[in-house]
């Protein structure tokens, strides 16, 4: 909650109730966007270099070639994914600013219509006309609060964090790099690619399983199901790349 919103809340809430709020702490998970970026980065970082390494191993490439190509892919993938996260966040910012300007103009141009929309929104929550009329009138006296209300409850938009774009870019890129080096580790230690690919499969599938379990835990889905699904997708991708390389080679 921003300082401005906190000020509004403290002014409008009775002292006794404000005291209760000040001494009450709710344990909610509030890092959803960061977790989403980590999931995107790690899942792609584990899967894409894993499939590439398996495909090159299937084509009988040496460990040094697989490692070189893998590192190049991790670097390019991290930049690409990070840039994608940055552009997506900037698009959200632009969309919010555009909709806020439009809503602000409507509040000035057609205030009666906008007030009717406030009443309609409140009525959807089972609030009677005699109960929501004071709320509508109070919002009309405070244009900024009125605008915030319409943005949240009519359009369902939350104001983006201005730091979100860079945060998303770096989080996704770093997560991609961390995930991408796991399937490449065996190629750093084992000179024969066909031996390295076996170790890579074991290590990466285990990492995918652990990652899938953690993803399920944080997203609220069934952890074991998420773990098996994530590992299965990685196995399919690497097997397809390996088999395709063998087919092309022959």
Curated annotation (Swiss-Prot):
Of the GO CC terms on this record, one is: vacuolar membrane
- Where does the record say this protein resides? Vacuole membrane
Q: Which GO terms describe its molecular function?
A: manganese ion transmembrane transporter activity; metal ion binding
Technological use = Over-expression of the Arabidopsis vacuolar iron transporter 1 (VIT1) in cassava plants (Manihot esculenta) increases accumulation of iron in cassava roots and stems. A transgenic approach to increase vacuolar iron sequestration in cassava may represent a viable strategy to biofortify crops in micronutrients.
Q: How does it sit in the membrane?
A: Multi-pass membrane protein
UniProt KW Iron keyword? yes
The residues that hold Fe cation 3 are: 106, 114, 117
GO BP:
intracellular manganese ion homeostasis; iron ion transport
Per UniProt, the keywords (alphabetical) are: Ion transport, Iron, Iron transport, Membrane, Metal-binding, Transmembrane, Transmembrane helix, Transport, Vacuole
Q: Where is it expressed, tissue-wise?
A: Highly expressed in developing embryo and seed. Expressed in young seedlings, predominantly in the vasculature.
| Record field: catalytic activity | Fe(2+)(in) = Fe(2+)(out)
Q: Which stretches are Vacuolar in the membrane topology?
A: 59-64, 191-192, 249-250
Phenotypic effect of disruption? No visible phenotype under normal growth condition, but important reduced growth and leaves with severe chlorosis when grown on soil at pH 7.9 that causes limited iron availability.
The entry marks the following residues as binding Fe cation 2, namely 103, 114, 117, 150
Give the residue spans that cross the bilayer.
38-58, 65-85, 170-190, 193-213, 228-248
Extract the ranges annotated as region (Cytoplasmic metal binding domain (MBD)). Answer: 91-166
Residue numbers on the Cytoplasmic membrane side? 1-37, 86-169, 214-227
Q: Extract the CDD domains matched here.
A: CCC1
Instruction: Summarize where Fe cation 1 binds, as residue positions.
Output: 103, 106, 114, 117, 154
Q: Which family does it belong to?
A: Belongs to the CCC1 family.
Supply the domain comment: The cytoplasmic metal binding domain (MBD) is located between transmembrane 2 (TM2) and transmembrane 3 (TM3).
Q: What else is known?
A: Can mediate sequestration of iron ions into vacuoles when expressed in the yeast ccc1 mutant. In seeds, iron is strongly localized to the provascular strands of the hypocotyl, radicle, and cotyledons, but completely absent from these cells in vit1-1 mutant. In dry seeds, vit1-1 mutation provokes the redistribution of iron in cortex cells of the hypocotyls and in a single subepidermal cell layer in the cotyledons.
According to the record's subunit comment, the protein's assembly and interactions are: Homodimer. The dimeric interaction is mediated by both the transmembrane domains (TMDs) and the cytoplasmic metal binding domain (MBD).
Give the protein's biological function. Vacuolar iron transporter involved in the transfer of iron ions from the cytosol to the vacuole for intracellular iron storage. Involved in regulation of cellular iron homeostasis. Vacuolar iron storage is required for seed embryo and seedling development.
Q: What is this protein called?
A: Vacuolar iron transporter 1
According to its UniProt entry, this protein's organism is Arabidopsis thaliana (Mouse-ear cress)
Read off the lineage from the record. Eukaryota, Viridiplantae, Streptophyta, Embryophyta, Tracheophyta
């Amino acid at each position: 909650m921003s300082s401005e919103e906190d000020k509004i809340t403290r002014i409008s809430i009775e002292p006794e109730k404000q005291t209760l709020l000040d001494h009450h702490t709710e344990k909610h998970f509030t890092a959803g966007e960061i977790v989403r970026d980590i999931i995107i980065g790690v899942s792609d970082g584990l899967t894409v270099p894993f499939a590439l390494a398996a495909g090159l191993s299937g084509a009988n490439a040496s460990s040094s070639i697989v490692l070189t190509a893998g590192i190049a892919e991790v670097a390019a993938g991290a930049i690409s994914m990070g840039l994608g996260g940055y552009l997506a966040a900037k698009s959200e910012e632009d969309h919010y600013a555009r909709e806020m300007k439009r809503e602000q103009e409507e509040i000035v141009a057609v205030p009666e219509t906008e007030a009717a929309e406030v009443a309609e929104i409140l009525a959807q929550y089972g609030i009677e006309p005699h109960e929501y009329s004071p709320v509508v009138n109070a919002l009309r006296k405070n244009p900024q609060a009125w605008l915030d209300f319409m943005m949240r409850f009519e359009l369902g938009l939350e104001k983006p964090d201005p730091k979100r774009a860079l945060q998303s870019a770096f989080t996704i890129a770093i997560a991609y790099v961390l995930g991408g080096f796991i399937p490449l580790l065996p190629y750093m230690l084992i000179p024969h690619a066909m031996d390295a690919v076996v170790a890579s499969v074991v290590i990466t599938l285990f990492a995918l399983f652990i990652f899938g379990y953690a993803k399920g835990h944080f997203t609220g889905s069934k952890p074991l199901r998420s773990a098996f699904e994530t590992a299965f997708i990685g196995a399919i991708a690497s097997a397809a790349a390996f088999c395709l390389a063998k087919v092309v080679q022959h």
